[in-house]
A protein has these predicted regions:
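A conserved donor-nucleotide-binding helix/loop in the catalytic core
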Residues: 76-104, 110-119, 127, 167, ...
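Conserved donor-nucleotide/metal-binding helix-loop-beta segment in metal-dependent transferases, i.e.
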Residues: 112-149
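Short, flexible, basic/aromatic active-site loop/helix in glycosyltransferases
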Residues: 148-163
Length: 272
């Protein structure tokens, strides 16, 4: 009698763990406004603050093992450099390279004591911005007033949603998932601007709220707006030197900035 011996080979699959190190980027846009159709858009122009901002984030990136990139050439070329940041949604290759991208205005200062924002906010599902107390504490009845709802762009957004989500757009973190979720709304930037005559910050708030993307409120100290008034400078992680005073040579914060960042070359010319 023939006997058949069946040999069964057992393959043990051991999952390979890829040690993926998260790559995080800090990005700023500082482009010659004269390359755009509206160089005086929103009264924004070149100023000395950008050198301190750039230098502070270069040091911050080195300290925390991050990457820093400063964009100096137009891509979208729409109205003014402030609209260039929407390329972070429109160009998908950004997230072939990075897990998270933080946009910062060129008048935001990374304070020397600031911790690693990406370590504290590692969720890859959400769009993140600093809690802005002015909007969080605004009565619901005031959310849709003209000064916060220019030309009715937020008419379809509930007052509660506005109070929970609305943010100041000088600092935010974008991830691949949040960018993909928001993309159909971001693509409309020219049409929405044409319809409502809104600024880029209002448009971004609209895109976040209208899209329903997962939103994460970061601590308010990641974007502390300051026009030179006296505050406890040990509290802010990122100091946002907003407003027109920074265009004046006597702006009170320049003395402090020189102490915090003594290696900034004051002779470095500001582009016009």
């Amino acid at each position: 009698m023939l006997r058949y011996i069946i040999v069964i080979n057992y393959f043990i699959f051991v999952p390979v763990k890829y040690n993926h190190r998260m790559r995080n980027l800090i990005i700023q846009y500082y482009i010659d406004t004269n390359l755009y159709s509206q160089p005086n858009y929103n009264n924004l122009g070149p100023n000395d603050m950008e050198r301190y901002s750039r230098h502070s984030f270069e040091l911050y990136a080195q300290k925390h093992g991050l990457e820093f990139l400063r964009i100096t050439k137009p891509k979208l070329a729409y109205k003014h450099p402030t609209w260039e940041r929407f390329d972070l949604w429109l160009e998908p290759s950004w997230f072939d390279r990075y897990d998270q991208i933080m946009y910062v205005d060129s008048d935001v200062i990374a304070m020397p004591h600031a911790p690693n924002i990406f370590a504290k906010h590692a969720n890859l599902d959400s769009f993140k911005a600093a809690c802005y107390i002015r909007y969080r504490s605004m009565p619901l009845d005031d959310q849709h007033q003209k000064h916060t709802n220019p030309n009715g762009i937020f008419d379809a957004v509930s007052s509660e949603r506005m109070r929970q989500v609305r943010f100041q757009t000088g600092v935010f973190i974008l991830t691949k998932r949040s960018a993909e979720h928001m993309l159909p709304w971001i693509r409309q930037y020219r049409d929405v601007d044409k319809q409502y005559n809104c600024d880029d910050g209002t448009f971004l708030n609209w895109a976040v709220m209208a899209s329903g993307v997962a939103y994460e409120d970061m601590d308010k100290n990641w974007n502390v707006k300051n026009n030179g008034q006296s505050i406890n400078f040990a509290e802010p992680n990122f100091l946002h030197c907003a407003g027109g005073k920074k265009y004046k040579m006597g702006y009170g914060l320049y003395g402090r900035l020189d102490k915090w960042f003594p290696n900034v070359n004051s002779a470095d010319p500001v582009k016009s």
